[in-house]
Amino acid sequence: MRLDSISIANFRNHTLLEFEPGHSVTNIYGRNGSGKTSILEAIHYCALTRGFSGNNDREYLKFGEELFTIRSSFTSGQGIATKVSVAYSPKREKRILVNEQELQTFSSHIGTIPCVTFTPREMVIINGAPAERRRFIDTAICQYDRKYLSDLLLYRRILQQRNALLSSEQDPRFIDSALDVLTDQLVATATEIVLVRKRFIEHFTSMLGDVYQWIPEGAEPSILYQSSLGHHENLYEKDKIQQVFRERFETLKQQELQRRQTLAGPHRDDLQFYLNKREIRKYASQGQQRAFLVAMKMTLQGYLYEASGEIPITLLDDLFSELDEVVSGTMVETLATKGQVIITSTGKKEGKGISCFSVDDYKSSEEP
C-alpha cells in the first residue's frame, strides 16, 4: 500500500497543508510544535478512522474552526486506487467517504489501508496498563481478519449488556435467568476471540525471534498471552475452551453479582514480554524496552503483509529521539526495503532514497 497524496484543512495546527510522500522513505522535519505528527495522524485517520493519540475527534479540530477535512489518495500493491476523505464537525460528527461512498460503519473500512505506527506514547504497550497491550493485539488482528473485528464488536455489546444486568435492581430470578443467556452468548464469542489471539501470538513470537537478530544484544524475545483460562492456557480446542469459560463464570457468579461486573473474558486478558526469559517491564532498561517495541513493529509489518498480501504503510513519529542511531537506522533501512515509510524528526535526515519535506518551509511559503 502506498500513500500518493494527502490534503488536510483545519486539522490540529494546520490551516491547510498538502503532502505527497516518496515511494520509499520520506522524512517530515521541522521545529517542535510545527505539526509534523499531525500529518502522520491524518494518514492514520484515513487508514484506521481515528488518530493515534486519542479517540476524541474534537481534539483534532483547529482552535476556533468548525470543521476539519482530510482528503487522501492511496494505491495498493495491485495498482488499485483508493480515495479516502474524512470530515468532522461537532455539529455533524464524523463522516468518512471511500471512493466517494460514505461509510455506514467505520469498522467496515479497517484493513483497507493497512498501517503500522511507532510513536513515543506507544511505550505504554510495554510498561502501561493491560488495556494498552490488548489494544495492540486487537488493532493488529483487525487489520487482516474481519471476522475477528466482528466478533470483537459483538463481544463488547454482550459485555455491556451483561454488566448492565449485573448492576440492575431487577428481580433476582429474572437476573439469574437472563444472566445464563448472556453468559452463553459471551462464552461463544469469547472463545473465538481467545483462539485467534493465541494463534496470532504464537506465530508473531516466532517471527519476532527472526527480526530480533539484528538487535546488537542478540537476546531471545518471547511473548506470553495471559487469558482468563487460568492454568488451561494451552487449550486450542473450541469446545474445551468453552467448557472452561462456563466453569469459570459459574465459580465467579456470586462475586460478579456482588461487584456488579464481568470478571472473566478477553477484556481482562494481558500480554507479558520477555528477553532471555526475564520480564521486560521489570528487568529491562528503557533502551531495551524501546528496542523490543521497535522489533515488534517491524515484525507486525511483515505479519500484516503475510496475512493480507498488502504491505502496510509505516508511520514513525520522532523515531530518532527515541532510539540510538544504529537501531533507528537499521529499522528504517529494513522497513524501507518492504514498503513506504514516513518519518518525522526535528532535523533533516538525508540519504540514498530518502525524500524530505520541511513543514517549516511549507508554512512559510503559505504565509501571505
Swiss-Prot record:
Binding annotation for ATP: 30-37
Pfam families: AAA_23
Name of the protein: DNA replication and repair protein RecF
CC annotations in GO: cytoplasm
Location(s), subcellular: Cytoplasm
Family in the record: Belongs to the RecF family.
HAMAP family referenced in this protein's UniProt entry, alphabetically: RecF
Domain of life from the UniProt record: Bacteria
Disulfide bonds: none
PANTHER family, sorted: DNA REPLICATION AND REPAIR PROTEIN RECF
Keywords: ATP-binding, Cytoplasm, DNA damage, DNA repair, DNA replication, DNA-binding, Nucleotide-binding, SOS response
Keyword DNA-binding listed: yes
Function comment: The RecF protein is involved in DNA metabolism; it is required for DNA replication and normal SOS inducibility. RecF binds preferentially to single-stranded, linear DNA. It also seems to bind ATP.
PROSITE patterns named among the record's database cross-references: RECF_1 (PS00617)
Segments traversing the membrane: none
A single MF term (Gene Ontology): ATP binding
Gene: recF
One Gene Ontology biological process: DNA synthesis involved in DNA repair
